[in-house]
Swiss-Prot record:
It is linked to Macular degeneration, age-related, 6: A form of age-related macular degeneration, a multifactorial eye disease and the most common cause of irreversible vision loss in the developed world. In most patients, the disease is manifest as ophthalmoscopically visible yellowish accumulations of protein and lipid that lie beneath the retinal pigment epithelium and within an elastin-containing structure known as Bruch membrane. Cone-rod dystrophy 11: An inherited retinal dystrophy characterized by retinal pigment deposits visible on fundus examination, predominantly in the macular region, and initial loss of cone photoreceptors followed by rod degeneration. This leads to decreased visual acuity and sensitivity in the central visual field, followed by loss of peripheral vision. Severe loss of vision occurs earlier than in retinitis pigmentosa, due to cone photoreceptors degenerating at a higher rate than rod photoreceptors. Residues 27-86 bind DNA. GO terms for cellular component: chromatin; nucleus. Gene3D superfamilies: Homeodomain-like. Residues 1-33 are annotated as: Disordered. This is Retina and anterior neural fold homeobox protein 2. It is found in: Nucleus. May be involved in modulating the expression of photoreceptor specific genes. Binds to the Ret-1 and Bat-1 element within the rhodopsin promoter. SMART domains: HOX. Interacts with CRX. InterPro entries: HD (IPR001356), Homeobox_CS (IPR017970), Homeodomain-like_sf (IPR009057), RAX/RAX2 (IPR043562). Residues 1-10 have a biased composition (Low complexity).
């Protein structure tokens, strides 16, 4: 038996026929990573209303520099989390919302004899070269925009879990440096 082009099992069962294109892969959006400031503002808005209207969502989206659809999806996910917490509380008889354990602030101050010298362009003081910004810490413009506590750890709010783990890694690294280079 002879098959002409376009006939046979390859095209009958879902293969490509003449003039058809291969289906394009569905684009998958990357996960949104929210800043501490964005999460704080979103949580504050959630405390005020679990179902904000479009105008409120658009206003909030502009405030935190996110698309409105991201804010909308955040509220959907947050409501699901809230319902899940409510179910857990009613099932266990607990009254308070589950919280992450408070992590202690880790001390990073070293005694003066053990401190490592910093290059002048890295430190928190005025720039060594005028017109060149500092590399560590938020600048005064950001502090003024977001308020004095916007960049502080917010352990009570539960948003700084990642920050706490980074601090722990930094502490371990500092201890490793102390072991590697004992003070002179």
């Amino acid at each position: 038996m002879f098959l002409s082009p376009g006939e046979g099992p390859a095209t009958e069962g879902g293969g490509l026929g003449p003039g058809e294109e291969a289906p394009k892969k569905k684009h998958r959006r990357n996960r949104t990573t929210f800043t501490t400031y964005q999460l704080h503002q979103l949580e504050r808005a959630f405390e005020a209303s679990h179902y904000p209207d479009v105008y409120s969502r658009e206003e909030l989206a502009a405030k935190v520099h996110l698309p409105e659809v991201r804010v909308q999806v955040w509220f959907q996910n947050r409501r699901a989390k809230w319902r899940r917490q409510e179910r857990l509380e009613s099932g266990s008889g607990a009254v308070a919302a589950p919280r992450l354990p408070e992590a202690p602030a880790l001390p990073f101050a070293r005694p003066p004899a053990m401190s490592l010298p910093l290059e002048p362009w890295l430190g928190p003081g005025p720039p060594a070269v005028p017109g060149l910004p500092r590399l560590l810490g938020p600048g005064p413009g950001l502090q003024a925009s977001f308020g004095p506590h916007a960049f502080a750890p917010t352990f009570a709010d539960g948003f700084a879990l990642e920050e706490a783990s980074l601090r722990l890694l930094a502490k371990e690294h500092a201890q490793a440096l102390d072991r590697a280079w004992p003070p002179a």
